[in-house]
């Protein structure tokens, strides 16, 4: 099936960050086969021509660190620091999860993400009370592209830890490269919730299965102090000593890094998922993204969970990410719009190992989103497209979402998830949680 999308302003995010003011995209099944400017002549004998009527078309957004199973916890535990937030709010509530509640929570997060323009994401979920196969089936049904990872902790006894490792290894073997749309990573939660033995086992699983690693690391000053006091090393050095960086690794946060650590991470292909809103809300600090990029670290923007954000709007994350770098460096040129967009599209895709998406070019997966600026005063005058996408747009502006060539959202309506049912069930299950 060949489809051509015509009369579009196309933000390609190719190597030149080219914006085509009047162009078209030809899609064959799940792949882009051509992106060109000008009027479309049906030389390709396409099956369908869809008039975009001047809409902006850009690559689907890529969220590099999420916890969609936590979506029912929005608004619980506001105005708290990370450690008490986890220990007194999040973990006690997660211990009450059932398989049905976990699916309802996941659906809510998926619906929010896809309707606001996210097409791919990398996720970590706490397996307590969760049917992992049901979660993966739910993500698959949404039509989104994802790496969904089972989180490991060293809670409980040594036998509990051994069982957690065994279950995680089975999960990795089951779902790594499950399909072109769905995969997983090895996901120890953090150095402060995992023993040395568990981290070493995670490194082994990643090496033996050739998977990536996803971990929270260097998120707060307290974490750095505690790990240094316990192990005599800062978190980066400690994680490296456990073997985690033998495989490409995504660290969520990286707020507290020094120059030597940034150089080390770049050398060992350790990527950073930057969560600006979450880091601000939890009082964790501001990651020095400018210094990361200058050191050669791959960086992708992320939202974290709705419990610490409190939304999954990647446009908002782009805007706050660039404004923060300008502010902390007192440099208005820091993180310009092209870079901010890259960190939410092609750069983010590279961070989580999904190079097949993130830009609109021949050979890439047909993952793209659209915005109609014609009826939106905040996007007018409409000629400064890149600026408006970073500084003025929001997830609420999304019209259409195409993932792998399929219309997942069209004219604002999600075709893969039942919005009315999901919102009803989210409220019902939330009422059952005991705070």
Swiss-Prot record:
This is 5-methylthioadenosine/S-adenosylhomocysteine deaminase. Its EC number is 3.5.4.28, 3.5.4.31. Zn(2+) binds at residues 65, 67, 216, 304. It comes from Bacillus cereus (strain ATCC 14579 / DSM 31 / CCUG 7414 / JCM 2152 / NBRC 15305 / NCIMB 9373 / NCTC 2599 / NRRL B-3711). Its cofactor is Zn(2+). Binds 1 zinc ion per subunit. It catalyses: S-adenosyl-L-homocysteine + H2O + H(+) = S-inosyl-L-homocysteine + NH4(+); S-methyl-5'-thioadenosine + H2O + H(+) = S-methyl-5'-thioinosine + NH4(+). InterPro entries: Amidohydro-rel (IPR006680), Deaminase_MtaD/DadD (IPR023512), Metal-dep_hydrolase_composite (IPR011059), Metal_Hydrolase (IPR032466), MTA/SAH_deaminase (IPR050287). Keywords: Hydrolase, Metal-binding, Zinc. It comes from the Bacteria. Pfam families: Amidohydro_1. GO terms for molecular function: 5'-methylthioadenosine deaminase activity; adenosine deaminase activity; metal ion binding; S-adenosylhomocysteine deaminase activity. Catalyzes the deamination of 5-methylthioadenosine and S-adenosyl-L-homocysteine into 5-methylthioinosine and S-inosyl-L-homocysteine, respectively. Is also able to deaminate adenosine. Substrate binds at residues 94, 150, 189, 219, 304. Gene3D superfamilies: Metal-dependent hydrolases (3.20.20.140), Urease, subunit C, domain 1 (2.30.40.10). Belongs to the metallo-dependent hydrolases superfamily. MTA/SAH deaminase family.
